[in-house]
Amino acid sequence: YSDDECRERYIEHFTARHDALEELRAFLPGIFAKTLLHAFYFMKPKDSEKLMDLLLQTSFEDSLPFFYPLRFVLASLGNPLLESVHLDASMFTYLSPKKMSAIGLPYDLGTFASFLNGFSQLSDFKTTGDYAGMCQVLTRVCRLLSEQIGLLNKEVTDRFGKNPNQLPFVWHIQAGRPQVYYNVAVSIIADVRKGVYKNQEFLPTPATLAEKYGVSLISIRRTIALLNSVGMTETINGCGTRISLYRKPLESLDLSSPGTRKSLIFYLMGLQLVTINVRTVAQESFNAITPERIEEIIRLYEQETQSRNYLYTHGQILKTVFYSHKNSEIRAIFSPLIHIMSWGIPLSYLGDSDMDAKGEELDLLISLLKSGDKEGFARQLEMNSWNILIRKRQKLMDAGLTDAETIRIPALEILNLASDSIHFNSH
């Protein structure tokens, strides 16, 4: 592209994303800071030294000044799913001097030097184990990021106007992108939850399923193989494939397929992402949950209490918390996690049952929801998610999924420290 063409593309990049950038900067500081705190906590000491080397090598001229340090820190969590959320958001803002100078906007190197200085301080705090001090620096760095996005947005809009064709932020899952058959499997699990397909009943023929979900017969066969491997369905020669949600030994989990292993690791990644962020989101969305929706959740919970099969209430509460949030970008980022959580349904029937534990946890959560205790509800939802992550991770490790060990359990003291020490005013 010529310089003029680049300039036009840069201008379009920002003017078409004004609304999304405002939404992103309204919530990113809290989510970023709390995620980075966990990432630093899990970072190995030798990686802290590597981070300092990376900071010294980071160039102001090439890209977002702290993009590479950010990616390095996030990698400590071992969760590409979570990493991709933050990296997409970072590149979405893309505050590079090249872009800004091309469209004639001032670029304050001092501001961006403070980002790198902040990461240097964070590395020092990691060495000394001062996570309270780390919270202060993370708050300052992430607040500055939000302010700079806002200033840039205003300057661009004042100078070039607001593009009427606004584009939303789109989260591209960069690592471990699901295949078509994975998405169809999740859709079928969702249809089981909705009662479209009932337990012990046969699914429609593969040809009918292919037409319904708009995929090839090969994809449907792979979908059925995936669902069979996790115990969601079973195929009977000459009869077809039926939903088979009943108690099975853990050994019946078939981990021979890479697709199955990948799907289950994906599930644990989603659980970790939820555990780290759900208290923040729940605190902000609690007051927007309608009385009608609360009644629906209570009815579902009471039905599951009668059967002692707590399969759907936790997921419906998560869905409600995410969808009730006023920030459209929060909804865009967290809504896909509802589908990822679906894999917990067949896992509940494999090996030892955790229904009693889930029942006790939901008792507490529902009582807090009824009472209107926002802080207590958000804290308990985080705790429930933390417990589920521990149980499911251990179950998959016991089944032989060794990669499950790479998904780290967030430390309770860090979850609590993040909640107590990292706060931002809403825009």
Q: Where are the language model's segments positioned?
A:
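Long compositionally biased, domain-poor regions of proteins
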Residues: 187-191, 195-196, 207, 212-214, ...
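Ordered, small/hydrophobic-rich secondary-structure cores
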Residues: 8-121, 342
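Short, structured motif recognition centered on aromatic/hydrophobic residues
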Residues: 24-36, 67-75, 81-97, 188, ...
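Helix-turn-helix/homeodomain-like alpha-helical modules used for DNA recognition
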Residues: 15-61, 129-143, 262-301, 376-386
